[in-house]
Amino acid sequence: MEAGNDGAAEDATGTGAAFFCRLFDARGQSQVVSRCALGACQPARDTLAWVDLCDPSDADIDAVWAAWQLPPAARPFLDGGTVPEVGQSEAFFWVRAVVAGGGDKDRINGVVLVCVAGADRVVTFRREQVAFLQDMRVQQPGRVGVLGAESFVATVLDRLLGSYFKAIDEHELAIERLEVSILGKGACDALKELQRLRRWASRLRRMLAPHRVVFGAMSRPDFRPDEGREADRHFTALDMRFERALDMVENARDQVLGSFELFSNQTALRTNEAMRVLTFVTVVTGLMATIVGALGMNFGAGLFDSGDAGFYGVIAGLLAMALGAFALGRHQHWF
């Protein structure tokens, strides 16, 4: 079939458009399909059609459902929540998952992604931009047409897990920078960063762990028994990759605990250094006070005849000593 040439086709080619459709064949060729031509886009053998919906209108969704006769049970699944789930009906199945990404350094956000697939056609749906889906819109991959809908969904979900691996890499870099700071002179400022990284790792685990139900169900032999061993192999590999991602998230939480132990040890070492200095100062001043007390300081020094001026001068000197000691302590990170 030919791609549409009207205004809708122009919208379909944009990487930021709400509607995007591409038809792949086994020869490694692909073509963009407009929304108006979607009804005529009925994939045959060794072809695969993919529709990507980014924050579409209800009219766009209804048009896709009507053109491809997608199961009605999957329609309310699109905006039905954020909890990862999977379902199927006859020739189609659908899955909801959460992509890691976005937010700021204090909080990582997730984007809900829904895939509806079957009969050599795949629909992906999200309300926000997802980087790897935007890349897939412009890429011209090889013989994607030979893949079934199940294998294409496995590819999408594998990229979804890649977003968690990327987030874990960023977390590990933050841990390394923090530990370098702790071993340097920034230990006093590390506690807030430790708290942030702990919350960040816990949030990432809460986002990833519920996917166990999805990947566990998809890896069972009875999930898509009519699609052959290839789909089973892809889903099993996907479940193994999920378990690896979950282990790495758990390890990220342990890394925060290890950094906290390093922080505690460094704090204890600095406290010991400060106590050694304070002990030395106490011994010296105590010895001086003992000598002064023994002599009674009964000398006819002019200071004792200076009256109020001498008194206030001594007070000013004591205040200056206190401020100097405070400045020294802050500079040495004693408190």
Where are these regions (language model features)?
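Peripheral, non-transmembrane regulatory/ligand-interaction domains of membrane transport proteins
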Residues: 1-220, 226-228, 237, 241-251, ...
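Hydrophobic alpha-helical transmembrane segments and their immediately adjacent juxtamembrane loops
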Residues: 69, 240-335
